[in-house]
């Protein structure tokens, strides 16, 4: 029997990596976040946090505050940003893509406002990489979960898959691996 020398990423790792790549498009220096909406193991839409399409980026307007400790702190400051989850849902809507019954992968646990939007768009499962301190809104999040409206699960990349992804990003991909 041939020994398996190639480990494929799990579906969760695969879609989380796509969300992480989407986050690289963010101009938010405080919280670069990416999201990908998936149904039947197919990507429906991606999103990242930033200003609405066609609008100037926060960084180009001098409204970027990378020292913020939370998204809530931006309420006192002029934030132009649309959250990654909302952006992905908007992209799906703009292109007539149904999100009912879909799954979303996000690099940061959704805030309560995005969670309400996710639920309203018919997305039933949320996979996130990093926890978000939702403060006093955690009870509302937990109520949505208890009511069966949505499920949340924290996921991460294994070290092996993260290293493999870094190699793929740094080296030419479509060449024979045997010659390396």
List the predicted regions and their residue ranges.
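Zinc-dependent deaminase catalytic domain
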Residues: 1-180
């Amino acid at each position: 029997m041939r020994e398996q020398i190639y480990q494929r990423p799990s579906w969760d790792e695969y879609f989380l990596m796509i969300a992480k790549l989407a986050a690289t498009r963010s101009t938010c220096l405080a919280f670069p976040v990416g999201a990908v909406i998936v149904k039947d193991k197919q990507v429906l839409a991606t999103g990242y946090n930033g200003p609405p399409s066609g609008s100037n980026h926060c960084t180009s307007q001098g409204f970027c505050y990378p020292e913020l400790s939370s998204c809530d702190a931006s309420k006192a400051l002029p934030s132009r940003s649309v959250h990654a989850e909302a952006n992905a849902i908007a992209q799906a809507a703009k292109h007539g893509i149904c999100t009912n019954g879909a799954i979303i992968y996000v690099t940061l646990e959704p805030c309560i406002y995005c969670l309400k939007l996710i639920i309203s768009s018919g997305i039933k499962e949320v996979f996130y990489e990093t926890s978000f301190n939702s403060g006093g809104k955690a009870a509302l999040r937990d109520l949505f979960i208890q009511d069966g409206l949505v499920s949340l699960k924290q996921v991460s990349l294994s070290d092996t898959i993260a290293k493999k992804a870094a190699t793929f990003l740094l080296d030419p991909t479509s060449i024979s691996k045997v010659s390396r």
